[in-house]
Amino acid sequence: MGRFLSCVLLTLSLPAAAQAPDWQLISQSRSNDQLVYWYVDASSIVRTDEYLRALLRTSWSAPQYGPDQTAYQSSTYLNYFDCGKRMIAYTGNTYYRNIEPVGLPVHEEPEQPLAQLTFQAVTPGSAGETRLDFVCKFRSKQFMT
């Protein structure tokens, strides 16, 4: 009976562990006397039709304020990457009070269908280019192994 219970508990814990984000810090910068950190959840990178899709996160060392003056210190969002054309589309922003995206969000913007998204060319040297380079290189390494 004890062995059975252990197996049940182990099985119940697996989905949660499999879904835990694998945040990889890909860049940081200084802006207005604060640090800005950009992360990619490496476990979320998947191919969707001709694009790569990944969950990203931005965190700030000091609170930011939305239009209604709600404070937040991190946001997560979905990016679609066209590696060949070097373009990105964004959707599904979720904002959190703390530097880690945990707990209840303070604001959420719904994910839009891929067909409704606008792809934008990345600016050389920008955080967008860093995200695109990381995701496209990371995924190509995964396909080669």
Residue map of PLM features:
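N-terminal secretory-pathway/extracellular module detecting exported/lumenal segments
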Residues: A18-T145
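N-terminal signal peptide c-region/cleavage motif recognized by signal peptidases
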Residues: S13-A17
